[in-house]
Amino acid sequence: MIGKFSRMALACLAAGAMFTGMSAQAKDVKLTTTDTMIPTGDAGIQLFVRNKHPAGQTKFAPEKILLYVHGATYPSETAFDLPIAGKSMMDLIAARGYDVYLVDVRGYGRSTRPPEMSQPPGDNKPIVQTRVAAKDFGTAVDYILKKRGVSKINVMGWSWGTSTVGLYTSENNAKVNRLVLYAPQWIRTEPPPAQWPKLGAYRLVSKDSARDRWLKDVPENKKADLIPPGVFEAWAKATWETDPDSVTR
């Protein structure tokens, strides 16, 4: 589901900078990658889960297991596992000995798109609100707990994903070792609008509008150097390829 919070990808670049210090250690660590579709309690809805960990390692303590979830616009895969200079944020964390997972909630990335997404957005109410996202996130948590034989894990949300993991943790505290809130969307420097626009089932975002949002509020003399050459194009290509209808909309 391509929506409006287009700054997530820019935050991905910032996160990559945060983990630059891990690069040397990550360089020679071989990782195992597994992609899985897991069922939910709703008929026909499956969730995409990716796992990366050091090759040959199958036992992990709860404090070494991490599940990440995306924000309101783009899927986890291209926010958390897009290689920049050869490594993604997910790669760098896994290379430090972590068992790292990402999940796309329904309607995003490779996860099942609800049938309402085949209809015009104005025909239905929002279909993936925070309560639904938290439910899907919990499905992924339970999958990992069972797979690794542990009782709790670390969880991380990005942007709107902080609301998802925050809600989940408030109701399932015993299953969470540590809660990481990265770039919470409720931290604002301007007052909210007096009236929010009416939302449909989903929202559409173009590549041009995504780039514009990345560069919003950036001083003109800084814009040319903000995004490394080719990074936006690589991210946009990978992101829009996750939407099977992006070419025809």
Give the ranges of each region predicted by the language model.
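Bacterial N-terminal signal peptides that target proteins for export
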Residues: 1-10
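N-terminal cap/lid segment of alpha/beta-hydrolase-fold proteins
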Residues: 27-61
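Short, surface-exposed "cap/lid" segments of acyl-processing enzymes
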Residues: 56-102
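Glycine-rich "HGGG/HGxG" loop immediately N-terminal to the catalytic nucleophile
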Residues: 76-79, 103-125
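Alpha/beta-hydrolase active-site loop
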Residues: 121-148
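Conserved hydrolase catalytic core segment
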Residues: 148-187
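Alpha/beta-hydrolase
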Residues: 190-249
